[in-house]
From Swiss-Prot:
Location(s), subcellular: Secreted
UniProt keyword list: Antibiotic, Antimicrobial, Disulfide bond, Fungicide, Plant defense, Secreted
Pfam families per UniProt: Gamma-thionin
GO biological processes: defense response to fungus; defense response to Gram-negative bacterium; defense response to Gram-positive bacterium; killing of cells of another organism
Keyword Disulfide bond belongs to the record: yes
Lineage of the species this protein comes from: Eukaryota, Viridiplantae, Streptophyta, Embryophyta, Tracheophyta
Protein name: Defensin D1
Stored Gene3D superfamilies: Knottin, scorpion toxin-like
Physiological role: Antimicrobial peptide active against fungi, Gram-positive and Gram-negative bacteria. Inhibits growth of hyphae in the fungi A.niger (IC(50)=3.5 ug/ml), B.sorokiniana (IC(50)=3.0 ug/ml), F.oxysporum (IC(50)=9.5 ug/ml), F.graminearum (IC(50)=6.9 ug/ml), F.culmorum (IC(50)=6.9 ug/ml) and B.cinerea (IC(50)=27.4 ug/ml). Has no effect on spore germination. Destroys spores in germinated conidia by disruption of cell walls and membranes in A.niger and B.sorokiniana. Causes vacuolization of germinated macro- and microconidia in F.oxysporum, F.graminearum and F.culmorum.
Species in which this protein is naturally found: Nigella sativa (Black cumin)
GO cellular component, one term: extracellular region
Amino acid sequence: KFCEKPSGTWSGVCGNSGACKDQCIRLEGAKHGSCNYKPPAHRCICYYEC
């Protein structure tokens, strides 16, 4: 099971899930990452093991 947390290093709207994933894994130690719609915009969300 994964817990999601907004990226602490991504700024602005997320338009590239691949780049978001790479940044979550490389810079934040996450297992995965993707762009998710969190009103009011798409954000880079990192996923960690709970």
